[in-house]
């Protein structure tokens, strides 16, 4: 848990100048002005930090539920997750069509792929809805938003559920110490991932 907090703080500190600079270089800086762009950039970093906290809490409990369910849906979604995650990483954030040059369907699919690769959830979606509204973006931005919402549902139902299913093997040998060790290792890995994710 300590690494989650460290990752959140570190990511926010790194993310504020990064997101602010990115926002100031974007076309929205012309519409919003430098002052408002700086505020939006800081808000984006804080939203990501807040999202991380909520993610860990929600995914922990839903992951335990998925572990008990043991449904075939988990395996189907995991396969879909791998495919969309790879595509999302390849396409990266630059695929966001904020100037209406593409179709709504392309934007929708981009939102799904990038959203899954970035652990999008409903809390970030709510913030980004306000962000897109402030930035004056048109329907393409909301199409990305809709795709990101779908991705958020997928990520909640799948990723942590699969992790807990893997770590359930430690419980089968009835070793509480081994199970706790596995959970701690998972938390450390996720904490490191948070730091790296926000630093890149």
Where are these regions (language model features)?
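Selective transmembrane alpha-helices of multi-pass membrane proteins
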Residues: 66-95, 149-160, 171-200
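Hydrophobic alpha-helical transmembrane segments in multi-pass integral membrane proteins
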Residues: 54-56, 114-126, 187-200
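C-terminal ends of transmembrane helices
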Residues: 22-32, 89-95, 162-169
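Membrane-embedded alpha-helical segments of transport systems
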Residues: 43-54, 118, 150-157
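Small-residue-rich segments of transmembrane alpha-helices in multi-pass membrane proteins
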Residues: 45-48, 102-119, 180-190
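Juxtamembrane transmembrane-helix termini in multi-pass membrane transport proteins
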Residues: 2-65, 127-143
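Small-residue-enriched transmembrane helix starts and helix-helix packing motifs
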Residues: 1-16, 38, 42, 91, ...
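Membrane helix-loop-helix hairpins that form the core translocation module of multi-pass transporters
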Residues: 34-101, 106
């Amino acid at each position: 848990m300590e690494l989650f907090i460290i990752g959140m703080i570190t990511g926010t500190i790194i993310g504020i100048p990064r997101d602010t600079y990115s926002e100031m270089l974007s076309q929205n800086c012309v519409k919003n002005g430098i002052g408002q762009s700086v505020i939006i950039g800081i808000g984006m970093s804080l939203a990501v930090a807040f999202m991380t906290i909520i993610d860990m809490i929600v995914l922990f409990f839903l992951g335990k539920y998925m572990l008990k369910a043991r449904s075939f849906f988990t395996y189907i979604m995991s396969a879909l997750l791998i495919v969309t995650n790879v595509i999302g990483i390849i396409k990266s954030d630059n695929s966001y069509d904020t100037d209406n040059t593409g179709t709504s369907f392309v934007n929708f699919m981009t939102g799904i792929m990038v959203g899954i690769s970035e652990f999008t959830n409903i809390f970030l979606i709510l913030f980004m809805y306000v962000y897109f509204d402030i930035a004056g973006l048109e329907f393409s931005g909301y199409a990305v938003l809709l795709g990101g919402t779908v991705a958020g549902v997928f990520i909640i139902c799948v990723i942590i559920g699969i992790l807990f299913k893997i770590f359930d093997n430690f419980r089968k040998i009835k070793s509480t110490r081994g199970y706790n060790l596995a959970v701690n290792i998972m938390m450390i890995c996720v904490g490191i991932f948070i730091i790296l994710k926000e630093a890149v």
